[in-house]
Amino acid sequence: MASRWPLRLTACFALFLASAVLRAGGSEDPPLGRQTVEAGVQTLPGATTDRAVLDRYCVTCHNSRTRTGGLALDTVDVTRVAPDAETWEKVVRKIRGRMMPPPGLPRPDEATYDALALHLEGALDRAAAARPNPGRTETFRRLTRVEYQNAVRDILALDVDVSSLLPKDDASHGFDNVSNGELSPTLLERYLAAAQKVSRAAVGSALPSPASHVVVLPSDLTQEDHLEGLPFGTHGGVVFPYTFPQHAVYEIQVRLARDRNENVEGLTEPQQVEISIDGSLVQTLLVKPNRNQSGAYYADEAVDKHLKVRIGVGAGPHDVAVTFPRKTFALEETERQPSLARFNMDRHPRVQLAVYSVSITGPFETSEANETPSRQRLFVCRPSRSTAAAEAACAKRIVSTLARRAFRRPVADADIEAPLRFYREARATGDFDAGIEMAVRAVLASTEFLFRIEREPKNVATHTPYRVSDEELASRLSFFLWSSVPDDELLDLASAGRLSQPATLERQVRRMLADKKSEALVTTFASQWLYLRNLAATSPDARQFPDFDDNLRQAFRRETELFFESIVKEDRSALDLLRANYTFVNERLAKHYGIPNVYGSRFRRVELGEDSVRGGLLGHGSILTVTSYANRTSPVLRGKWILENLVGTPPPPPPANVPLLQETDAQGRVLSMRERMVQHRSRAECASCHRLMDPAGLSMENFDAIGRWRTRTESGSAVDASGGLPDGSEFTGASGLRTALLRRPELFVGTLTEKLMTYGLGRGLEYSDAPSVRAIVHGAQTQDYRFSSLVLGIVRSDPFQMRMSQ
């Protein structure tokens, strides 16, 4: 079985034993080429030089007797790297990251480091070119929930939420599209249920009974201000997209937010509630306080039961909105703490109405199906006559067109035989549309749709690299850049055998990156790489951080999404992810960051001053929050995130039963975070990893657990933000970390390339992929590492265009 790459070496890999014959201390040795003849080292880089470097700095621990970290470098032949390519790739990674020898022991100088790495990389790259190994993706890869939903959107012009129908995807290698082809009976039932829902919505068939869809707002969502997408002169509420399954009457009902005693908050006088669809006002409703009660709260369960309206709505996607008109006079506000609702109740009550939930129930009083976008997309023809032959011909055309898009390849009669059989059976007891609905259901339940299938060509030898077909290349492209199926243009080029032509391929990649569907790179790739998905489950302690609410949580995520999107859409340098002098904020986030003159809930791009701490990802509240604990910062989590996602040298997993950090010393004095980390590193089982992680994480200590700038820690002591990286560089603060990362840009760009490649291939990288990664980074360097140069490099690479036979 192929090994995972980059391999997570054990903690001992980077440790040199205290009894090593190397000199003690952290001095940097002169280049080996300038040393005495007795050292036996040649001036020019080569195998003899490499052997001498390894013997001097590595073999003392990494030998066949001690095998520190499971690695022996005394027996490998430095003149023949191909037989031990996996071992040498480990060595190169450690050398490039300056992770060995570890800090505190003699190290080569920069010239020797680079010479050794360049020579080994050159030999490894030549060996890889002589015997290409593009790796092997799984033959069957099941679509993720996001891919399924996007595919339905693009095939049928239908937005259907399938999150409640399909199970959550497990992640591997950091991404949920790295999956296998398992399909249990339970999972098959879920897919059949999803196919039934989608096919019914696509055709516009009547539902067996009215159904309800409920949108519940987070309890810590502040609704005192105007929200983007709602009419001016209103405050609070919600606007959300909803696909109405049929042309019919629906009931929209609003429930207001309450406190723990079920009293409606902010209801001290009659107030209005507006319900609108697609920006058009449907109805204004009046809610009044209970006359039989006095005071600010009214324990009347029925006070908002009348807040509902029935309205005819056309099938298809619409925006539903509920909000509150502002009074003509200003309400007196209190400084309500926007934390979890249970801490706001009674102590800091809302002074204005707020929406708790909006439910949509229906359809009622259905009418004839109208031409929705999904029907227009699906019904590429209508029977010319009401005869069996005319209907059969049209049905075949509809199913063939649908199957080509769903199966991502040309289809033959055998491919559509089963869907057409379902059509005929349903048509025998229903109308033409009923038959088409069953055919759609059969297509969506087919393994050809649910799985990305890559078949080996006939007569290909075992363990032999081969080029994937143009149809498979189209699918790789579309799922990489769009998280969806190929469009007709891609399929047409693939069918003609032209997609793999270099000029055509580049044009298509640039077209796809410019398409709105490339936002999937933000919502699926970046959100997993940068841990944005973890924000939803992040709840900072409400007592320590009363200013944190769902508005801020959403703003954190949106800032980073818009920022990454700007890198993609504007084709900026990948280094701008670290060094950009701009970000995206709304009023809520701007106040949190201390950025003046930003008003309203709309996000806008703002330029940052040279001394701003918010430039690049390192200043984003999203990342600073998900790498913290609920009540304090975590240099460990932040350091691990930096090493894994920016530097590309992830530490090994922690040992079991790691003891908690002690917050006080023996005398009861509260320890600073740095003192706690020193204590942690004093443990032998912890030291090897924490020596690498902690210094990087400690450099971010000027940001608290919700990303605010600070000069004092939770315990009141002055922040010490001095830190370092495994390469021995030392600096202070996030700006120093940024400078250190930019000093050797190939490390960060290489890490981003590995992440993109893992996501694009849908498999974990192996040691054999390293030459391709190096080639991509080297090629992108001439273009200042523009994002498109990385994507094009990946798409042109052997791992993306080829596959190893079984």
Where are these regions (language model features)?
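Low-complexity, glycine/serine/threonine/alanine-rich intrinsically disordered linker
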Residues: A2, V21-L71, P83-K90, K94-M99, ...
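Positively charged n-region of N-terminal signal peptides that target proteins for export
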Residues: M1-R8
